[in-house]
Amino acid sequence: MPKRILQGTVTSDKNEQTVTVLVERRFKHPLLKKTVRLSKKYRAHDPENQFKVGDVVRIEECAPISKTKRWKVVTEAVTA
């Protein structure tokens, strides 16, 4: 099964080797036919502490690293 890759914004970098990433997704509601925005926070592994608040990053699913971390930061997303 392929690993999921998501893109989001770093909202917290206060923990050692961990960042909190806010991932927002949009979809059309099946009944209301309206675009709905949902967001979810993921805790991701950042071994070098290189990402700061406000950075747009890509995170990849991985084996559990701790109680709450199941994602790792792959790269900083290119914003054009």
Curated annotation (Swiss-Prot):
InterPro entries: NA-bd_OB-fold, Ribosomal_uS17, Ribosomal_uS17_bact/chlr. Coiled coil: none annotated. The keyword RNA-binding applies. Belongs to the universal ribosomal protein uS17 family. It comes from Cereibacter sphaeroides (strain ATCC 17025 / ATH 2.4.3). This is Small ribosomal subunit protein uS17. NCBIfam families: PRK05610.1, uS17_bact. SUPFAM superfamilies: Nucleic acid-binding proteins (SSF50249). The keyword RNA-binding applies. It holds the Pfam family Ribosomal_S17. GO terms for biological process: translation. Part of the 30S ribosomal subunit. One of the primary rRNA binding proteins, it binds specifically to the 5'-end of 16S ribosomal RNA. One of its GO terms (molecular function) is structural constituent of ribosome. Keywords: Ribonucleoprotein, Ribosomal protein, RNA-binding, rRNA-binding. One of its GO terms (cellular component) is cytosolic small ribosomal subunit.
